[in-house]
Amino acid sequence: MSISVIDERSALDDLLSSCYGAIYAYGVIAAYLSDPDEALNAMASFRIKRDQLLTSFEELGYPAPPASAAYSLGTPVVDEPSARVAAAILEEAGVAHWANALFYLPSQIKQRECEFLQACAVRSFSWSGIAKAFSFAD
């Protein structure tokens, strides 16, 4: 789900929603991989990010939106190659969501969120083998 980002609150809502969706998606993706560790590590990264964002919601006095019961993966996942494609697309979407939100985020979390954007770009490259914007980041 994509939220129209127009201010600080909507930026945070969009990022949290992206985390919820990614956590769900990586559970499905991991089930189709012969070695699910990479997907489970990515899921753990999104869980940590979700928790950081929930703390930011609390500190800023905003109510955090709840997670949905299920999410669309955006592409069918039926085997290992399609799971890897879904993971790459998921991380590319993460780059887009974080890039869109950065302008509106509070200054105290911008650096942290920029680093997460870069981590999404690196994971996208890891899944697809195709370099995208920001793939130079460690």
What are the residue ranges of the model-derived segments?
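All-alpha RGS (Regulator of G-protein Signaling) helical domain and cognate RGS-like helical scaffolds
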Residues: 1-138
